[in-house]
């Protein structure tokens, strides 16, 4: 959603981002789930796994090439020269903030370790600094999904209220 905020050319009247990624480089270093940033961002098609992985002889630290850790090539890292990773980080939504002008509601769980709440707070702060009408809704006791019944009701109420405010 944050990428669309900077590229949509007035296609949308409003945006709602739930647990969105604002700064891809920051996200890479703060998520508790490294599979997605490593393999989705350029690592999967280039993954080289040391045959010792999973054995008592498995490597435990970085190899001499500087891009392998524990026998798995880190193709999706911000410091990777992998073309897919380079393009991915060049298109990080935080680099498009100067194009933001469409109202944005940011929703995030305060205990989300997959996409840390900092991503939502940073996007909200960027929208505020750009003068974009924006709202921040954080559920301090929820994680990546808003599952508690009362919180889910509030999530839906605020979601539709935001759309009603900007899309009529």
Outline where the language-model segments fall.
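Active-site-proximal cap/loop segments of hydrolase catalytic domains
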Residues: 1-168
């Amino acid at each position: 959603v944050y990428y669309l905020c900077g590229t949509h050319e007035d296609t949308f009247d409003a945006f709602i981002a739930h647990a969105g990624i604002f700064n891809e480089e920051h996200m890479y270093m703060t998520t508790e789930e490294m599979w997605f940033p490593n393999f989705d961002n350029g690592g999967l098609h280039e993954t080289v796994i040391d045959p010792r992985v999973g054995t008592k002889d498995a490597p435990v630290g970085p190899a001499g090439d500087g891009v392998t850790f524990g026998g798995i090539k880190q193709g999706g890292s911000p410091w990777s020269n992998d073309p897919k990773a380079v393009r991915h980080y060049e298109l990080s939504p935080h680099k498009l903030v100067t194009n933001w002008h469409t109202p944005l509601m940011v929703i995030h769980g305060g205990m989300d370790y997959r996409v840390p709440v900092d991503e939502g707070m940073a996007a909200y702060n960027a929208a505020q600094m750009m003068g974009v009408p924006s709202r921040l809704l954080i559920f301090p006791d929820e994680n990546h999904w808003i599952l508690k019944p009362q919180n889910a009701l509030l999530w839906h109420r605020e979601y539709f209220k935001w759309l009603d405010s900007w899309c009529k």
